[in-house]
């Protein structure tokens, strides 16, 4: 078993995962992750937080939020292929992992989007593969447990298109056939958002019956890798995310699940950073409740992609440098404001609700490195500070 001793002091209550409710109060050392984790997945059951997959491969770690001095403890390895971007949520005392993307076998020529589902049982510290397939590709989707024991899932890449594109790309030697390679990339990346056929249903999985259903259609463009915060029982805020590869949206939507259906409401967009810098939107941002507000921090985008899309150039990020953002926004239920900055640009990590702020865990930095650090964004409704 692997536990981490090195830790950071956080004079806060112990955090809950951003998409979970509740918090554990304590005054303890908060340990960094055992390894850097980006593009992974996380969930919480009671006082136990679980994080893994992504850049950690099949590794899976747990932290007792009532006793964080024990550090992150290695749990049973994930039994499926190493996967990025899986949708993960807890229900009925177990953790469910859906889809994601990666190579089906180590010698596979190209990655695919998986249509598999797995369950982790903390009691036996074991994984099992479920006898089901996801109805659509769910890589990049967000999953959240509902009060009735089911799991709702938002967004997700189209498996058929994604698999074919990566197989075609993998079959071309871009050094020997640069024109053919460029033509293929331009063709795929130059499509309008609707052409990618991302999942536009709010899917629901019922662990008790091992079956799938729908809570209705998303009336907006479906997106992947949005930031997500739980606002209350059955209420979820989805912020920004991709609407096609390389192009984000600044939109935010409130989803209320009532009487077996998802009801959508558009709320204020993320604000411009300045008069000269329009809001590009972000993918892979951190989000959670901080007091009465929602904080959204970091994420990644391509500066100039919105202008290209507005001009009809749908390969919107062509030639643009990827930017890992350090901006932090606060939402009071009506309006957004720029709250402050992260210590560095970060995206694709995990976020934990904590009394007084938002705990930022791992992620990817501007060099593409997976980070281990954990720090608290403290927010009192007026001023943002960083506590290491």
From Swiss-Prot:
Superkingdom to which the source organism belongs: Bacteria
Kelch repeats: 48-92, 94-147, 149-186, 187-232, 236-285, 307-356, 358-387
SUPFAM superfamilies per UniProt: Kelch motif
Signal peptide: 1-26
Organism for this UniProt entry: Brucella melitensis biotype 1 (strain ATCC 23456 / CCUG 17765 / NCTC 10094 / 16M)
Similarity comment text for this entry: Belongs to the NanM family.
Record text on subunit structure and interactions: Homodimer.
Any one of the GO CC terms: periplasmic space
An MF annotation (GO) of this entry: racemase and epimerase activity, acting on carbohydrates and derivatives
Record flagged with keyword Methyltransferase: no
UniProt xrefs under InterPro entries: Kelch-typ_b-propeller (IPR015915), NANM (IPR056734), NanM_proteobact (IPR019936)
Catalyzed reaction equations: N-acetyl-alpha-neuraminate = N-acetyl-beta-neuraminate
Protein name as annotated: N-acetylneuraminate epimerase
Residues passing through the membrane, by range: none
EC nos: 5.1.3.24
Enzyme class: isomerase
Any Pfam family: NANM
Compartments in which it is found: Periplasm
Role noted for this protein: Converts alpha-N-acetylneuranimic acid (Neu5Ac) to the beta-anomer, accelerating the equilibrium between the alpha- and beta-anomers. Probably facilitates sialidase-negative bacteria to compete successfully for limited amounts of extracellular Neu5Ac, which is likely taken up in the beta-anomer. In addition, the rapid removal of sialic acid from solution might be advantageous to the bacterium to damp down host responses.
NCBIfam families reported in the protein's UniProt record: muta_rot_YjhT, PRK14131.1
Gene name in the database record: nanM
Keyword annotations from UniProtKB, A to Z: Carbohydrate metabolism, Isomerase, Kelch repeat, Periplasm, Repeat, Signal
Catalytic machinery residues: 242
């Amino acid at each position: 078993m692997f536990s981490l001793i090195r830790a950071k002091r956080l004079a806060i209550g112990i955090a809950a995962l951003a998409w979970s409710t509740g918090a554990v109060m304590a005054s303890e050392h908060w340990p960094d992750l055992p390894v850097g984790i980006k593009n992974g997945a996380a969930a919480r059951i009671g006082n136990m937080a679980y994080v893994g997959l992504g850049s950690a491969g099949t590794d899976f770690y747990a932290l007792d939020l009532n006793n964080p001095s024990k550090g992150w403890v290695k749990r049973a390895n994930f039994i499926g292929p190493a996967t990025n971007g899986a949708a993960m949520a807890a229900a009925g005392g177990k953790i469910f992992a859906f889809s994601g993307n990666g190579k089906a076998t180590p010698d596979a020529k190209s990655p695919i989007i998986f249509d598999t589902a797995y369950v982790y049982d903390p009691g036996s510290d074991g994984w099992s593969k479920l006898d089901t397939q996801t109805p659509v590709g769910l890589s990049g989707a967000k999953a959240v447990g509902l009060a009735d024991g089911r799991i709702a899932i938002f967004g997700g890449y189209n498996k058929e298109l994604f698999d074919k594109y990566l197989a075609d790309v993998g079959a071309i030697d871009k050094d020997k056939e640069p024109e053919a390679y460029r033509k293929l990339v331009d063709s795929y990346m130059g499509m309008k958002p609707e052409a990618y056929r991302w999942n536009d249903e709010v899917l629901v999985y019922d662990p008790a019956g091992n079956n799938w259903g729908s809570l209705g259609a998303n009336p907006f463009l479906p997106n992947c890798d949005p930031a997500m915060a739980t606002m209350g029982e059955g209420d979820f805020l989805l912020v920004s995310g991709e609407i096609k590869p390389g192009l984000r949206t600044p939109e935010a939507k409130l989803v209320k699940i009532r009487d077996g259906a998802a009801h959508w409401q558009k709320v204020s967009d993320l604000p411009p950073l300045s008069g000269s810098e329009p809001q590009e939107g972000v993918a892979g941002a951190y989000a959670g409740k901080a007091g009465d507000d929602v904080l959204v921090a970091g994420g990644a985008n391509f500066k100039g992609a919105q202008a290209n899309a507005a001009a009809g150039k749908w390969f919107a990020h062509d030639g643009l440098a990827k930017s890992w953002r350090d901006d932090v926004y606060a939402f009071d239920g009506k309006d957004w404001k720029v709250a402050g900055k992260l210590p560095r640009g970060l995206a694709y990590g995990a976020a934990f609700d904590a009394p007084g702020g938002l705990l930022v865990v791992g992620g990817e930095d501007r060099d593409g490195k997976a980070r281990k650090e954990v720090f608290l964004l403290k927010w009192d409704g007026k001023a943002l500070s960083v506590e290491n």
